[in-house]
Amino acid sequence: MNKLTITLTLIFLTSVCTFAQKKQLGHDELISWNRIQNSQISNDGNWVTYSLKPEKGDAVLKVWNSKNNQTQTFERGEGAKISGDNQFVVFKIKPHQDTVTAMKRRKVKKNKMPKDSLGILNLATSDLVKIEDVKSFKLPEKWSGWVAYHKEIEKPDTTKAAVDTTQMESPDTTQTKKKKSKKGKKKRPKKEGKKTGTKLVFRDLVTGKEEVVEFVMAYTMAEEGPRFLLNSTGKDSTFEEGVYLFDCEKEELKPIFVHKGEYKNMTFDKSGSQVAFHANLDTLEMLIAPYGLAYWKDGDETATILVDTTSQFLAEDWRVSESGRPSFSEDGSKLYFGVAPNPILQDTSLLEEEIVKVEVWSWTDDVLHTQQKNNLDQEKKRTYQVVWHTQENRLVQVGNMSVPEIQKGDEGNSDIVLGYNENPYIKSATWRGFPNPRDLYIVDLKTGKKKEIKKAVEGSGRLSPKAKYVTWFSAPDTAYFSYSIESEEIVQLTKNENVAFFNELHDSPSYPSSYGISGWTEDDKYVLINDRYDIWKFDPTGKERPVNLTQGRENQTRYRYIRLDPEARNINSNERQLLHVFNEKTKASGYGFLRMNTGKPVTILSGDFNYSTRPRKAKDTDKLMFTKQSFTVFPDILYSDFSFQNIKQVSEANPQQKDYSWGSGELYYWTDLNGNKLTGMLYKPENFDPLKKYPMLVNFYEKSSDRLHSYRAPSPGRSTINYSFYISRGYMI
């Protein structure tokens, strides 16, 4: 009896141990581990959306409510956007990936493949509307109530569709009544296609009412005004080919340019009251498409062609280029567009066998022949900027061969731009390497006159937000410089006397880079420049002494400014600013706040984790989402306000990790043969026993110990060691 009891007990304990033993990561896990994609937070901070996507397989959309901590799940949902009024989520519903793969193997024709569907979720009621066969959609961020979606080519018989991703029938509304011609022949109805377009639908999100426009090729929307712009190939005499504006408030489709042609690069100004686009009205299919630039504003009956091949403004053998999208300044006072010289055309009278196919290379070329081939498409699309002053009806050539590139100032509102020219130094770049020197210019947008401010700058010049200064980091001088537009004086800002503003750990045979600029304060008064650890406040005129705002060097703590408002053009010196904090010695990180006028930053959250450097804040509240990670902690989405006291976990991307043997990482110190003290990382399997021997992998690659607290997701790779995979299998790294 005792023997039987002992035997049963041993069997039970063995079973328990076997059951409790964690699994090793296998190759299946390399392709099934989830990543978080396309995360966003609503303007009011009450909603967070994100997709979970494995290496291979279908994504899952998650919609989280901060009020009740509940999450809704939508299979195969991707690319979600939250409406500006926080009432709706609009997203794509993809077909099953396995289905698509199987059909590709069977070589099913593209038009028979399953298409994406559209999902519209009402956040208040949780009602979901699905619309099949949608290839794209646009949901405005700064105004609300409408969504536009572009349909796929309609199938003649929807009952024969290969896969219906929403299980909904789509009525065929494209058929028109057939009219008999005078000769008694039936006129075929126009069909949708790549050259004729498909349906564009404007949907009122609240009422569900829809306005359908047929045979649409492309569409866009205004940033702030409730308007959409589209071009259609037309249907008949009642709806002709051209460019149309849909006003959501009036629910009205207005023709702004009716003409047969080809239209590209439609754009609004910020308010939606002005429109520009490229128009090719030629019907002869010339080798060089004669595009013109069209313009329309509120109150105009029709758009007008500002510039085309007949305009005296253009130099001989130059044209309006359709390669670059025209753009308005923020205040709408300027319209920028590109012009280019006509390309060299091939002799079309030659037969194919008469065309000599040879590549000619010369040692005198400024650019290596292989690089010329690599850059060929880019050079074919190169444009030179022109500005049209909308109030003055005046064109000014800004860019040309001597100043081929420009940077706009003050969101395009400024009357000057910064010009670049690296052409004189292109050849020497072959042996000099990066950065390529360039000459810097200030270009007057009223006159087109160019003033050279500095030759052969080995670094990128940038205009300040209000276009009062130009700053650049000179690589040979390892210093920042500032140029005043008003005084026309150059000032060296950083001296590298007590603190280096170049990469202190640079160890390659080239010039060291800088640590970057955090930004500018209001009205371009100060520029904030980073060193290895700290943020410094500099007077761009050089009159005031620089001020160290963060004082992190003593403790080897690095502070970096976090830009929470993507549209903020300056840093408000009177408000507290969120900083990312990282300690180089311990590798701990976190967040802190800084008030520039009151002293040192205050750390409010810190730990042995890698906290995200770019948390995202809700537009209208102090709620934000961020991540933290370590070798054992996946970077799931976290949610909090600026106190960081009540942190909620939003996502749980890989709950299965608890079932697998993982491991841990720690810093490892040693002295090299030259007597230098070095820092590395040592990763050990879970339940590491120092008395046992383990197989070990050694990875020498640059400086990676700062990534001690980085999560290493199982994933396939060609030339890297997947840490979690090997450690799970008993290796040390």
Language-model features and meaning:
Residues M1-T7:
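Positively charged n-region of N-terminal signal peptides that target proteins for export
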Residues T7-S15:
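Bacterial N-terminal signal peptides
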